[in-house]
Amino acid sequence: MKRRTFLLGAGAVATAAAQPGFRLVDVTAAAGIHFRHNSGAFGQKFLPETMGPGCAFLDYDGDGWLDILLVNGMDWPGHKQRKSTLRLYRNNRNGTFANVTERAGLAVEMYGMGVAVADYNNDGHPDLLITGVGQNRLFQNTGKGTFVDVTAKAGLGGRSAFSTSAMWFDFDRDGHLDLFVCNYVKWAGEHDVFCSVDGKHKSYCTPEAYHGSTCWLFRNRGNGTFEDVTAKCGIFDTSSKSLGVALLDYDHDGWPDLLVANDTQPNKLYRNMRNGMFEDMAVRAGVAFSEDGKARAGMGIDVADFDNSGRPGIAITNFDNELMALYRSTREGVYTDAASKIGIGQASRNSLGFGCAFFDADLDGYLDLMAVNGHIDETVRHIHSNVGYAQPPHLFLNDGRGNFRDVAGEVGGGFAAPKVARGLAYGDFDRDGDVDVLITTNQGPAYLYRNDVFSGNRSLRLRLVGTRSNRDAIGAVVRVFTPDGTQSRMVKTGSSYLSQSELTLTFGLGRREKADRIVIEWPGAGVQEHKNVGAGAYNCAEGKSISAQPRV
């Protein structure tokens, strides 16, 4: 998170446009979400205090309604004043949530950072990986509304690091989900570095003050345990300072690849060589550095086919004055940062971005882009008068013609109010067919925004269930064909920053009443096709016919 200033060309000029056909309504209090992040801050300005927390949408009890998990920190040893734990909220199916943390066995104190959700043992129940400072924790879902800590039993214990984002994926396509964990820098409270803006008072350090730390890759043995294959697979790299990770198929070979956002170090694009090894392609692909060849402060990340070209684009949030990156595939295997040309670059100049996500907010068939922002230094205005500590989010609406317009201030609900935001996740918690938003803030509350689409646009929602491939179908690619074009989505964990969105895929149909054709490419190489599928929500099991979900 280096403080640098770039002078880049002007971005695209937005023309007059119609008001968005949706509103984001703040329903946090009405929904019963009462949470405040504990960073443990006590005046010493330890680096981890300013980095968290993450959040997740998940259906932990399998009732078909999305629940909410919020990651929390804790007081530092020797300065304990209160107990703070993870927070799990169960969806009451009426717009409200109940705090079931204690009942679920998650009232655990740890200095948490991020969360990754997936059914790693293929038993039909989503499990939790919570990252943090110290030891990460793996909680297995019992299927009875509770979780048990299986960290040591699974072979993930005995490691201490400053872990951030994480991702479940099946890199060897054996049907068992493997685990990738981002690690940030080598940090310990007893070795904290003194950094200062004025030479007198301690401030939060930027990562240049610390050595990097390698990410970890764990292979799922299929028996409930994991093997550390970081070095064996070519991932080991102690120069990295990793904060975000996203899943993609970079070379369109059907094998999952990895894109890692690094802070003040080159980003990494790990291409799956299909033999248990990965090769870093980031420099060759054009995503390692900024356009002028410098490493930026990459935080949040997402990958999606935002222009319906069939090729995934890449969004990465960066430090203020570095501009948010939006990489577009210009030729096979090569990307160019188009952010400044399509309305995102200059709009994000004064933002320090964290969580980001592509989703179709207005259900028009084109993926929009949300980014949440907030500085790490509460005194930043004394240094840069145009940069605030609390910052408004961005909601870039995709016009379908290659341009984006920030409509955060036009969607109501106080959405554009400045926040010291970190985590971002999306999911349809009220089952009305559009995608709602969950945001966490550093040393502050969480926010739940209900999306109300009033334009008349419809959606097609698909929940995939693997039978031969991993049960969550992570890595599956779905293509939806309508007369307006072809949309493609991948089922994925990870992405954003420290957070996890729902695994169900949402396709905007606009005013169309159906999709002409749906093609599902499963992670195990099988392909299914369904024709004339009407708007609505469906379950799609591998090798079986599509079935409509019960109406609310």
Residue map of PLM features:
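Beta-propeller blade termini
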Residues: 52-62, 112-122, 164-173, 177, ...
